[in-house]
Amino acid sequence: MSKANSFNKKDLIACGHGQLFGKNSPRLPIDNMLMMDRITKINADGGEFGKGEIVAELDINPDLWFFGCHFSGDPVMPGCLGLDALWQLVGFFLGWEGAEGKGRALGVGEVKFTGQVLPDAKKVTYKLTIKRKVYRKLVMGIADATMEVDGREIYSAKDLKVGIFTDTSSF
């Protein structure tokens, strides 16, 4: 059976509840912390390094929760939420490939912010290319990524790292 190469919001919520890839697979956050509405493309051999790629989208509207509190009178999407979305997608990729355990962000080599997401924007697009996949005692994905708002690149990240752990008690 071939794997799906796109996912809708219902699928992403199912992943957050452990119902998409299995109860032991990495989960996406749910509710407000789920920072995407759909994954439009995912594969295991595309991207700049031939190890996989993901493209996902978040619909923007002025009623999103963060605009009401960040900042009063100057609403802007927090940069950390865009960065978290990129980590979420690396973890999702590892679960899609069959990894089991709990996903944890392990770091990022470099992040640059060159723009902002304002309430009048329409869509954020995340584009990730997988650089390295490790499937040993440690399961880890490393990716480079960009984030666009309405077609304009505003964030870039290099060496996003996510690990999948079967035991997080000592983490």
Curated annotation (Swiss-Prot):
One of its GO terms (molecular function) is (3R)-hydroxyacyl-[acyl-carrier-protein] dehydratase activity. Gene3D superfamilies: Hotdog Thioesterase. Pathway: Lipid metabolism; fatty acid biosynthesis. It holds the Pfam family FabA. CDD domains: FabA. Necessary for the introduction of cis unsaturation into fatty acids. Catalyzes the dehydration of (3R)-3-hydroxydecanoyl-ACP to E-(2)-decenoyl-ACP and then its isomerization to Z-(3)-decenoyl-ACP. Can catalyze the dehydratase reaction for beta-hydroxyacyl-ACPs with saturated chain lengths up to 16:0, being most active on intermediate chain length. This is 3-hydroxydecanoyl-[acyl-carrier-protein] dehydratase. It comes from Shewanella sediminis (strain HAW-EB3).
